[in-house]
Amino acid sequence: MSRVSEYGVPEGVRESDSDTDSVFMYQHTELMQNNASPLVVQTRPPAVLIPLVDVPRPRSRRKASAQLKMQMDRLCNVLGVVLQMATLALVTYIAFVVHTRATSCKRE
């Protein structure tokens, strides 16, 4: 049974450099010594989750709840403004169309 290092790589296996891909290539040295084709094992490094916004974690549930409520209030305010702008644009467009049709009918 072959021994495994602390990184999970069997002894007698070496890591090759690969700048273009995040896949680590390991070639078994024993096969290379026996003039056989090298055995290549591909493994991916563990996924690292990167937060989109760096928000410090509150120390208590009460603070977390208050922070969530504040973020929801901000979101609701932004959505309210967007809805008002969309409504104003729609009403302006309808008024423009009605005015244009009314003036074009009078000319005929």
UniProtKB/Swiss-Prot annotation:
Keyword Phosphoprotein annotated: yes
Parts forming coiled coils: none
Topological domain spans for side Virion surface: 99-108
GO cellular component, one term: membrane
Intravirion side: 1-77
Lineage top rank: taxon: Viruses
Region (Disordered): 1-20
Transmembrane annotation, as ranges: 78-98
Primary location recorded for the protein, binned into one broad class: virion
Post-translational modification summary for this protein: Phosphorylated.
Record's subcellular location: Virion membrane; Host Golgi apparatus membrane
Membrane association type: Single-pass type II membrane protein
Keyword line: Host Golgi apparatus, Host membrane, Membrane, Phosphoprotein, Signal-anchor, Transmembrane, Transmembrane helix, Virion
Assembly: Homodimer.
Family as reported in the entry's similarity comment: Belongs to the varicellovirus ORF1 protein family.
Protein name as catalogued: Structural protein 1
Organism for this UniProt entry: Varicella-zoster virus (strain Dumas) (HHV-3)
